[in-house]
């Protein structure tokens, strides 16, 4: 096996290069890892969908149990463009939760992809901060952070940025 034929996963490359490969003017802020209880907490998380393809959609909405109808309609169109439907994902409202539940959420849903809408990575419990519309790997999960679905829907440039991320994640 030659060195030229070695294939690395994106998460492996990210762990090899903790600092940027390219110098930029802004520094990425790293959050300290939060300590949680070692015991898993058995909880009945409320979510919409069947999570068949291990894709977790995290939203924040105080006015709905899961997601308002208008946002659900837009999200359904986004999922259809990615060859997914509501049965393939779990829609989780993060409104009444906090970062201390990060490990429990990951252990319960066991996602391969997490789409954060109106929830910052650090707020969700990730030990790093990354810009919106950047695909970021952590613990064998691909994360993308973006504004709320209400903000994205009318804005073509934001939709385009999200679409670039979705194409990368779902190999479209």
Where are each of the predicted segments found?
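A polyanion-binding, active-site-adjacent surface
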Residues: 2-172
């Amino acid at each position: 096996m030659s060195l030229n034929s070695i294939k690395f996963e994106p998460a492996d490359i990210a762990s090899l290069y903790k600092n940027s490969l390219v110098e930029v003017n802004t520094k990425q802020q790293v959050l300290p890892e939060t300590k949680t209880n070692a015991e898993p907490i058995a909880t009945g998380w409320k979510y919409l969908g069947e999570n068949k393809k291990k894709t977790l959609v995290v939203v924040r909405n105080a006015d709905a149990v899961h997601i308002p109808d208008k946002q659900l309609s837009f999200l359904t169109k986004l999922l259809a463009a990615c060859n997914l439907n509501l049965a393939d994902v779990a829609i989780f409202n993060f409104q009444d939760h906090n970062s201390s539940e990060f490990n429990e959420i990951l252990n319960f849903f066991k996602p391969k992809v997490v789409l954060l809408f109106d929830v910052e990575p650090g707020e969700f419990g990730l030990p790093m901060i990354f810009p919106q519309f950047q695909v970021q790997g952590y613990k064998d999960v691909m994360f993308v952070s973006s504004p709320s679905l209400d903000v994205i829907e009318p804005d073509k440039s934001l939709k385009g940025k999200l679409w670039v991320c979705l194409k990368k994640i779902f190999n479209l």
